[in-house]
Curated annotation (Swiss-Prot):
The species this protein was found in: Mus musculus (Mouse)
Keyword Repeat listed: yes
Complexes and interactors: Homotrimer. Component of the asymmetric form of AChE, a disulfide-bonded oligomer composed of the collagenic subunits (Q) and a variable number of asymmetric catalytic subunits (T). The N-terminal of a collagenic subunit (Q) associates with the C-terminal of a catalytic subunit (T).
Record region (PRAD): 51-67
One of the GO biological process terms: establishment of protein localization to membrane
Name of the protein: Acetylcholinesterase collagenic tail peptide
Length: 457
């Protein structure tokens, strides 16, 4: 059995109604309406213009389905028949007015006529049936986030669920208000002693700070390597003078030797420590030759003519007077035509092309200084009244003027004292603390105090 498509069935029903309407004899035999309505022949007689009675086909019962693909093979022949029926208008043959005859056979299809004017818009038809739902469309873009809705009533507490996995750490919240101080907890147990850390690297040497207070004694560490020998400690207090020993017997005098040849004159010896005795006045000498007058304006440092010697511009001048402690420091000076004062001998020296020559054989002594008799201090023999006698005039050793050196005598004991009074040796703030300036200070214990030294900022 052939099952027709709803669209095809609707087209067949339209054609069936059209064929029934076109047969008036069949309608009159079934429903006699000739008395109420004029017949089709009367209409043909009264109107010569009308050729045929054509009724518009009723609307289809079912809307045609929407085809996306190709047409169905069952619908293609039916659509062709429908197009042929719609395109073939029924022809009308004009004849003489006579009695209506039987309907003739259907003539051949004529040519399509001209397209008539567009008719008025018809009434709105009845809404058709709801079509089939189309395929789901492409999901659209998400719309903007709407305003949060009103908070609903709090629901009842549900059953305790299973503990879920720990979530990711959220952002740090704002700092809360400080809470109330809690109660003091119980003292915890003492932990195990941790391992001893490794020894760190030595840091950079810092600036010399002030001496702090002595801290508590630390634990004894491991024995390190033996360091270098330190400098001797401070000089102790002067002890009591010991008893004089017994003088030994004098030695036997040796035989007298032969007199030797007279040698060249030696260098001047150290000044005598004895008291000078004024001798007798000698006879008056012969008058000397007449000299020239060296009269002129008074010469001093502030005078502009100070640079010009009274003997002329070519005469040498003494640049400065140096103060040295001993012979070693005197030999280090290489300045020509200079005058130096030796503190150990208390005498002046002058340097020319031959070297350093003494120009003052009698040493200077301060007021109230007792001059010892010759042949006592400095001969290398310890005699009564002498604490020591090393036989040299060096004031930087442990024996100064036949007295033992002590802190406060004004002479720096080399190797024992850092300073003594104003004697710092060659040390200054610039050499003791490089990069600083100022004056060093000597404490009562003959140690250097560098507090007055300041650094450049």
């Amino acid at each position: 059995m052939v099952v027709l498509n709803p669209m095809t069935l609707g087209i067949y029903l339209q054609l069936f109604f059209c064929s029934i309407v076109s047969q008036p004899t069949f309608i009159n035999s079934v429903v006699p309406i000739s008395a109420a309505l004029p017949g089709l022949d009367q209409k043909k007689r009264g109107s010569h213009k009308a050729c045929c009675l054509l009724m518009p086909p009723p609307p289809p019962l079912f809307p045609p389905p929407f085809f996306r693909g190709s047409r169905s093979p069952l619908l293609s022949p039916d659509m062709k028949n429908l197009l042929e029926l719609e395109a073939s208008p029924s022809p009308c043959i004009q004849g003489s007015l006579g009695s209506p005859g039987p309907p003739g056979p259907q003539g051949p299809p004529g040519l399509p006529g001209k397209t008539g004017p567009k008719g008025e818009k018809g009434d709105l038809g009845r809404p058709g049936r709801k079509g089939r739902p189309g395929p789901p469309g492409v999901p659209g873009m998400p719309g903007p986030v709407g305003w949060p809705g009103p908070e609903g009533p709090r629901g009842e507490k549900g059953d305790l669920g299973m503990m879920g996995l720990p979530g990711s750490r959220g952002p740090m919240g704002s700092k809360g208000f400080p809470g109330s101080r809690g109660e003091k907890g119980s003292r915890g147990e003492r932990g195990d002693l941790g391992p001893k850390g490794e020894k760190g690297f030595p840091g950079f040497p810092g600036m010399l700070g002030q001496k702090g207070e002595m801290g508590p004694k630390g634990e004894s560490g491991l024995a390190g390597h033996r360091g270098p020998t330190g400098r001797p400690g401070k000089r102790g207090k002067q002890g009591q003078k010991g008893d004089s020993g017994i003088m030994g017997p004098p030695g036997k005098p040796g035989p007298s030797g032969q007199p030797g040849r007279q040698g060249p004159p030696g260098p001047p010896g150290p000044p005598s420590a004895g008291q000078l005795v004024m001798g007798l006045k000698g006879e008056r000498g012969f008058p000397g030759p007449p000299g020239r007058c060296l009269c002129g304006p008074p010469v001093n440092v502030n005078n502009p003519s100070y640079g010009d010697s009274m003997y002329g511009r070519g005469s040498p001048r003494v640049p400065a007077i140096f103060v040295v402690n001993n012979q070693e420091e005197l030999e280090r000076l290489n300045t020509q035509n200079a005058i130096a004062f030796r503190r150990d001998q208390r005498s002046l020296y002058f340097k020319d092309s031959l070297g350093w020559l003494p120009i003052q054989l009698t040493p200077f002594y301060p007021v109230g200084y007792t001059v010892k008799q010759p042949g006592t201090c400095g001969d290398g023999v310890l005699q009564p009244g002498e604490e020591c006698d090393d036989g040299n005039p060096d004031v930087s050793d442990g024996c100064i003027d036949c007295h033992r050196a002590y802190c406060g005598d004004g002479y720096r004991h080399q190797g024992v004292e850092d300073c003594d009074g104003s004697d710092f040796g060659y040390l200054t703030c610039e050499t003791y603390l490089p990069g600083s300036y100022g004056d060093l200070r000597c404490t009562q214990y003959c140690s250097i105090d560098s507090t007055p030294c300041r650094y450049f900022t």
